[in-house]
Design a protein with these regions (language model features):
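Structural signature of eukaryotic scaffold interfaces centered on beta-propeller domains
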Residues: 60-67, 104-120, 156-170, 207-218, ...
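Structural motif
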Residues: 32-35, 79-82, 131-135, 181-188, ...
Length: 294
């Protein structure tokens, strides 16, 4: 009987694990904060315009900070904001300032990678023009690291994401999307900006891309919002961190609409969805009942 219970327990938990999905927040080119399930990007459940930014400022990227699980946004004028995931209200917390001169730093480029390094709790900002910054979001103090580089060529980095993004972190790696070579790259060492090719995405993407990695149970899953050349909207894809291969999940679009949204960046909520937790609770309750009956 104990063996039977163990098998049932494994089956229930396996079902919960396989059905688990992630809550994804996206930043559109119209400064909308959208929300959808990683398994069904065609069913965007929420779309609110971001408000509370400085006049004429727009957001260039977003990410969840592992140390407090809050969503942060980087403004085009170099301001750092926290974002309310329910109503998209932006609250300014800092401005990017050079750690040596204490002068404001201008962002260079049209597309940016924005992601928290979970080990030192610093925000990495990369750009398609090679900018490479480390930001203390509590103070705005920023280190201008080495320009992004790759041998004799210039990479075109449009999305960045760290692995093992739980707090406190001990080890991590920084992966990037390069829209010029259509490659997944590893930035190693990160502060030097050196790009090492991991492998081809297998798709021809534009510079409009968002990238994020979520870590649960010590497992890293990578996702991206990518715009294919010749298309207007964005598609949601899984990224294989071992090979670089992108696998399309679907268009990112509102429910009951065939029009895809143009998405600049994505950030995956590190906290499991309530539905997933309810499913897990139901599974454990079922196991408990079976044990009592036995």
């Amino acid at each position: 009987m104990n063996t039977k219970i163990a098998l049932v327990s494994l089956a229930v938990l396996s079902t919960v694990s396989l059905s688990a999905a992630h809550t994804v927040y996206g930043l559109t080119t119209r400064d909308q904060l959208i929300r959808f399930d990683s398994s069904s990007p065609t069913m965007v459940m929420q779309a609110n315009f971001v408000w509370g930014l400085a006049a004429n400022e727009s957001l260039v990227g977003i990410d969840f900070r592992p140390s407090n699980n809050m969503l942060y946004g980087v403004g085009s004028f170099g301001n750092i904001y926290t974002l309310n995931t329910t109503n998209a209200m932006a609250t300014k917390v800092a401005t990017i300032m050079d750690s040596v001169t204490n002068m404001p730093i201008n962002l260079w480029g049209a597309e940016f990678g924005v992601d928290f390094n979970p080990v030192p709790d610093r925000l990495r900002i990369t750009s398609n023009l090679g900018q490479n910054l480390r930001v203390n979001v509590a103070t705005g103090s920023t280190v201008q690291d080495g320009m992004l580089n790759q041998g004799s060529g210039a990479p075109h980095i449009v999305g960045s994401a760290y692995t093992n993004n739980t707090f406190p972190g001990t080890t991590t790696q920084l992966f990037n999307l390069d829209s010029a070579s259509n490659m997944l790259t590893l930035q190693n060492p990160p502060n030097a900006g050196t790009q090492v090719n991991v492998g081809p995405l297998g798709m021809d993407i534009t510079a409009l891309a968002g990238f994020d990695i979520v870590t649960r149970n010590s497992m890293n899953e990578a996702f991206a919002a990518i715009q294919l050349n010749g298309m207007t909207g964005s598609k949601f894809a899984r990224i294989n961190l071992g090979t670089g291969a992108a696998t399309l999940v679907g268009d990112i679009s509102m429910a009951m609409s065939s029009d895809s949204l143009a998405v600049r960046d994505i950030a995956i909520n590190p906290v499991p969805e309530p539905t997933t937790m309810l499913a897990l609770g139901a599974g454990l309750a079922a196991i408990s009942r079976r044990r009592r009956k036995s």
